[in-house]
């Protein structure tokens, strides 16, 4: 199927496959009405085959051969009418920039060699020129395209596919990957080349020339190595490329440890804080409060929990590291001049569900930044998963593909950053800086106008989608949209761009752009985002099968066009790359207010915690901005290092005499576990049935899983691949397989990212944290208080689900011992942190209770005991200061993180624990909603920040605020009434209460909104809570003056 052939929809279970023609039929070439050249006025002429000479196959603009060749040699090399780059035609010489066209069998004209010289070269047995040309042609053509042996999509029509409804002929070629690697399977996809021999093979002349060529190469190698007979190599014969080769052999990345002057004091303070914490808890346990045992016991339980939580969070940050990448070495190693790029291919996944909550313009910018990435276009394929089967998403993607033909060449011509047009044109910087091209300003202005028109078209589609027709959506050709019922529709695939038709305005190829919507039927579990990502894994394996995959949320665009190259510096490094399962990039965000009121940037986690994990076994997977190794997602174990010598032991102890297992934990043979692939000898040990039970019943997909270096399986026709692609996204494909259990994104939690990374680390893989100077990806964050709390609620609920699942880090993964202990601490902390909301809520209530009752959580302390409290506070602040020192996090970002830890802990985390317990104990499932992505407001950039949206998550923090404020008023009033003696004990209680209020201050500002006016709903809640505590106040009666007089028992007065 060609890129413009149309939408393919089908269901494997129902044996249906239909081809729906797109919105517009392919435009025919312009009719050649005349035979006069529009440039010089001469006749156009004919080709050597007698056909009319056509210079441009796109528009058919009449140009004669001399003008055509002159324009290619001296001019712009573009058609004067449609501006498409002229391709080399048979009989014309090659010019710089031409691609390798395999269907042109025209060597003498291609290299501008006349017949006499060709004959002379054939008769000259010492002339090696033609031999080198033949060799160059052989290597060049073996690196590109598909030959006629594999089928030519433009000439060989495919047989019609019979469906349950109708028979539709499917013709054309599906744009399959040419070579996604350099493994043994890749070569079988290339065109079979018949070189042009200078003489008949097998003759003496051929053998003699081959021997001469071999001798010359051997002598050249010896001279470079300095072993030529007669002494050392001549300095004049020194090869200038040797230093470049030495540089290319260097590591592509290196680990940079934090300076010891920064990290050693930090570790010392951690140890001191641990010691002080032990003495502090010992003192608190041994000194109860007799008249306030419930308050004392509650505070002790909370403080012990906080201590355990701090240990789990702190010690995974013991080995923080930085990393450096060397992009120039990557290019020297895999991108040599004059040779095809050897960089591995990458499949990029973009997931979206609801276009009304995830605006199509946001998704379009993400897709445009992918298509314009700085990476070989034949190595990039973009798959967009539309899990809502929305026609709006489909149409907007079609518009995006058309706009990409203009946007991509503009980005690459002027090397602009970022390559998402919305954010490029909105950035407030000097766009003329470092731009010396004379036409830049003019073309930038024109491109901005083109983008504004593109936005108008997208917004028109969005406006049209607001009113759904009663009969459902109808495509422009009159066909009903297959996804009108979002819960019951066939699988759909549409290729918008690709090698068979995806060219930009300058005639250069564009990366593939594929629309995918998996099949959904009632009664089948779809597993939300994790299921959609697994469907993308399978369909990409069938169509392109790149060895690496990058997944992005629809609102995360590529901010650094070299981001993929940064990841390849780790994944393709010969020394350490084979054990790396994924490269995680930090999340950076646009559109956040300057003070980051609700800690949206999450800098403490991304710049401190993740750096610490990188020094252990690698960072956790955070759901987006991550480049995966495909083999790791298939459940394979990492390659093993050199085996140690076997230890000679007796069989007296069962642990020493165990029989070696034939299969690993995941049921993989040792050949797979050790090498990531299958040995030819051991391949027969695992039957096809076992593979299908693991990966599913698709022969094409199962074959692709055995290809570690990627590439499309050999002998695959476009029709078969198309049918398999529909098959692997069918709703019942995963039944009775390991998908979601051991393969791909793991099911069982709405935070599938944590589970997926955890499974990989348990198998022994390690991950890498990459922080380039320019942020690799940027996204949008919910700056509204209610949206932010709902987002945190979803994360916390996912952690609770993992804690109660069979993959809980407390119990899972001990058998193989591949997960390091500090890494396990981090995963345990990731799953239990929502439970901290219970002690945190109790601890934040204690100050108000103490102020209202006149009691406290600890007895009066001595001077010596006060040293424990002073030392504890100093160690807490010292740890934070030293963390900020080695990480570069500002004090404002650190403080915002502390504040939102309390805000989220007493609201979203608390609700997550309750919902998680209801789901586990009562089976009540809670559906999460997709966080809305804002498109921006031209009138006020932060209008969403001040918008008030009521949610039940606001009730607990509001109650805490009012309770502590009432407590402060009551405590001060009591001290005023009872004299100066009450101020001493009151100071500790007030400090405790103000600690809670200060941490909840951003929440209070969020309630006040822009006008500093409390909303009505909050006023009602405040009055209600105030009434309740007023009744409590009357019961306590703190304002009654307590009489201080003689004891009646002593004076004998009968009162």
Curated annotation (Swiss-Prot):
Keywords: Cell membrane, Cell wall biogenesis/degradation, Cellulose biosynthesis, Coiled coil, Glycoprotein, Glycosyltransferase, Manganese, Membrane, Metal-binding, Transferase, Transmembrane, Transmembrane helix, Zinc, Zinc-finger. InterPro entries: Cellulose_synth, CES_Znf_RING, Nucleotide-diphossugar_trans, Znf_RING, Znf_RING/FYVE/PHD. Zn(2+) 1 binds at residues 37, 40, 64, 67. The keyword NADP does not apply. Residues 439-468 form a coiled coil. It is a multi-pass membrane protein. One of its GO terms (molecular function) is cellulose synthase (UDP-forming) activity. It comes from the Eukaryota. Pfam families: Cellulose_synt, zf-UDP. It catalyses: [(1->4)-beta-D-glucosyl](n) + UDP-alpha-D-glucose = [(1->4)-beta-D-glucosyl](n+1) + UDP + H(+). The active site is at residues 387, 753. The chain crosses the membrane at residues 269-289, 292-312, 832-852, 861-881, 900-920, 952-972, 984-1004, 1014-1034. The keyword Membrane applies. PROSITE patterns: ZF_RING_2. A zinc finger (RING-type) spans 37-83. Catalytic subunit of cellulose synthase terminal complexes ('rosettes'), required for beta-1,4-glucan microfibril crystallization, a major mechanism of the cell wall formation. Involved in the secondary cell wall formation. Belongs to the glycosyltransferase 2 family. Plant cellulose synthase subfamily. This is Cellulose synthase A catalytic subunit 9 [UDP-forming]. It comes from Oryza sativa subsp. japonica.
